[in-house]
């Protein structure tokens, strides 16, 4: 069984308030949790990305770290990019994950832009011992 584990989410929200906005003002922990929930809607797609990468390297382990912005006006995840200094996985896997999460939308939108870093750690399943 192959596993992928969501490793961490670091989230910093800017403190700009938009007057007349019908959006909410989440505290940092709620913003973090809500963003994590949106990203987790793509867990199957991200697992599929890893499964495709395993066809090239059945022992593939690694971490993909993605940075992005949550736009205050739309709640949309934008400017999604791999943190190459912290990512230890093939480019094809990283690109697939970026494509999976880019454009997701946090609803309801927040009064603040958010800057986030999210990491996925992948570990290939140990082969079953021969009987």
Language model feature labels by segment:
Residues 1-19:
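Sec-dependent bacterial lipoprotein signal peptides
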Residues 20-131:
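Charge-biased low-complexity segments
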């Amino acid at each position: 069984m192959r596993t992928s584990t969501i490793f961490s989410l670091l989230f910093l929200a800017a403190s700009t308030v938009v007057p007349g906005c019908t959006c909410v003002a989440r505290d940092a922990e709620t913003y973090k949790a809500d963003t994590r929930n949106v990203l987790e809607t793509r867990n199957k797609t991200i697992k599929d990305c890893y499964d495709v990468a395993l066809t090239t390297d059945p022992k593939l382990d690694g971490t993909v770290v993605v940075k992005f912005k949550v736009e205050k006006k739309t709640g949309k995840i934008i400017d999604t990019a791999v943190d190459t200094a912290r990512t230890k996985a093939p480019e094809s896997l990283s690109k697939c994950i970026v494509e999976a999460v880019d454009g997701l939308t946090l609803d309801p939108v927040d009064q603040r832009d958010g800057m986030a870093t999210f990491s996925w750690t992948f570990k290939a399943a140990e082969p079953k011992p021969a009987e």
